[in-house]
Amino acid sequence: YDTNGTIYPGLIDMHNHLHYNTAPLWEMSPHSSSQTNEYGGYENRYQWKNHPNYSPHVTKPKNFVHSGAYWNMESQAMKYVEVKEIVGGTTSAQGGPSSGKDSFDSILVRNIEYYNFGADQIHTKVTELESDYIGNHIKTGNQSGNLRAWFLHLAEGMDESSRAEFDILVENNLLVGELNLIHGTALTKTEFDKLGEVGGNLVWSPLSNLLLYGTTTDVAAAKDAGVRISIAPDWSPSGSKSPLHELKVADLWDDEILGDIFNDYEMVKMVTSNPAKAMKWDQYVGTIEVGKAADLVVLDNINTNPYRNMINAIDTDVRLTVIGGIPIYGDQDLMSAMKGDDWEDAGLGKALDVTFIGVEDGGQSWEDIVGDLEMAMRFD
């Protein structure tokens, strides 16, 4: 069957907080002049959580939907936010909740921290890296060769206290090649050179950085240091919808601010093969090769350059998203050719299949999921 499009490896989201992604973009500005940096944003990530609107606009909407004390709709909410990724061609995503429910963690997108490809040696640390943090599981995993990736929020801000978190990493012997350093907005050439020396990785979320801090990571210095870079959206309160959307922000920043230091091929690698290599998944996904998992996205041909084609593509240009050989979303003609009538109408000529018989809540339809969440999000 001719897809009438271009086939790519599925996009990989290397940094998110998926359980917050039923919330809309958070409209705010620094609430204290003493916490405002020269770019008009916050000095560090520990300040904006104290904004008076953070709880009612970000935390409470998430808790009301997910928590068992309220609507207890974690299954519906997680399926919804994973579909937001899938319609943009994402096939794997980092940052799912730690509840570990089969109703969502083993279906739809690959949840990176869970068991995948015969192993689960991937660790995440979101909280502050304190000076007494030992991290023996990281050290032993690195020494044994079993560690696949360590996702670490670090140096998120613009002040010296943010930059100094990197010093703790070095002093505590935690600067390892499996590190996926998330944000790093405070880092300079000095730190990126050290990260590059060990073969470390950077996860860049330009939109969230710009909205929260007024500027973003020095990816030019990271590139010069040989650091492998991935692009990811962070979360919906201050980030974009998916890597496909974040790719456009990164491309605009590269063109307008950096002087086009990344070519189109390099940009596309940041959402496909770079993430796969950064967590030792490259023998399974990230490129299209015989024997690899069939995590694929088909995009309409809107540009003759296949790499620019992805950068310019929007959700409606996604003709098909396949995860592990299973078609999940796409144009109705392709979904019908591959699945018969086993799908739901998703509007705009698209089809979606979120049902997985054999897992908890696997019979929930897309119509039911949306209806439940619309009711819950009224906050009556």
Residue ranges and their predicted role:
Residues 10, 84, 194, 221, ...:
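Hydrophobic/aromatic ligand-binding patch that stacks against planar heteroaromatic rings
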Residues 191, 198-200, 226-227, 255-261, ...:
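Charged catalytic cores and adjacent phosphate/nucleic-acid-binding surfaces used
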Residues 95-240, 256:
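Active-site core of metal-dependent hydrolases
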Residues 10-23, 149-157:
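Histidine-centered catalytic micro-motifs
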Residues 16-40, 44-127, 139-143, 269-380:
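Active-site microenvironment of metallo-dependent hydrolases
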Residues 172-178, 215-303, 312-327:
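His/Asp/Glu-enriched, well-ordered alpha-helical/loop segment
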